[in-house]
């Protein structure tokens, strides 16, 4: 039994609040335990220079943590004049993950910007951001089609992400901050709706981990992602 009382294969309580923002095409607040992230999707009629004139769209992402999202105040990166390496890594992960489930030709010469702002951090902010970003992106595409800006749906798959790790010798699903900070292995799995993998990140914090341990984490992650897909469908089909 984990410190939180969860079983090794148990996700934290999850909720998705749809459309908290009124000025974007799509938005949601995802809550996974005490990790809360605001995700929004905004459509612009410009694309990066390398795509101009190609009648193809783009999806990119920005990620940030509010100063009060952790126990000690985080300095705003804007005030420091540059983004940290972790921020850049996470927003690139979110962006390329979203592009994997989009037919960019069907988007036309438009860019969708995903914004992920961490309101409260208790582990798994990047995976929560990806899972919530899909919901925001889905709502944005729905809005663009309703307005007849898009004629066909460019979304080709669901997407969700979840963390796994080896903690005190045991494979566990969806690590909170205390588990993550003391885990022997920390990994993140990004899945498409059919169960195929989009990205895997895995790091041994103390000593190398075995293939058997990796397979065990993969199985846990796949089951966790299936639960996330089910929740996404429930909230989106109910609107």
Curated annotation (Swiss-Prot):
The keyword Aminoacyl-tRNA synthetase does not apply. One of its GO terms (molecular function) is 3'-5'-RNA exonuclease activity. Pfam families: RNase_PH, RNase_PH_C. SUPFAM superfamilies: Ribonuclease PH domain 2-like (SSF55666), Ribosomal protein S5 domain 2-like (SSF54211). It is an enzyme of class 2 (transferase). CDD domains: RNase_PH_bact. GO terms for biological process: rRNA catabolic process; rRNA processing; tRNA processing. Keywords: Nucleotidyltransferase, RNA-binding, rRNA processing, Transferase, tRNA processing, tRNA-binding. InterPro entries: ExoRNase_PH_dom1, ExoRNase_PH_dom2, ExoRNase_PH_dom2_sf, PNPase/RNase_PH_dom_sf, Ribosomal_Su5_D2-typ_SF, RNase_PH, RNase_PH_bac-type, RNase_PH_CS. Phosphate binds at residues 86, 124-126. Phosphorolytic 3'-5' exoribonuclease that plays an important role in tRNA 3'-end maturation. Removes nucleotide residues following the 3'-CCA terminus of tRNAs; can also add nucleotides to the ends of RNA molecules by using nucleoside diphosphates as substrates, but this may not be physiologically important. Probably plays a role in initiation of 16S rRNA degradation (leading to ribosome degradation) during starvation. Homohexameric ring arranged as a trimer of dimers. This is Ribonuclease PH.
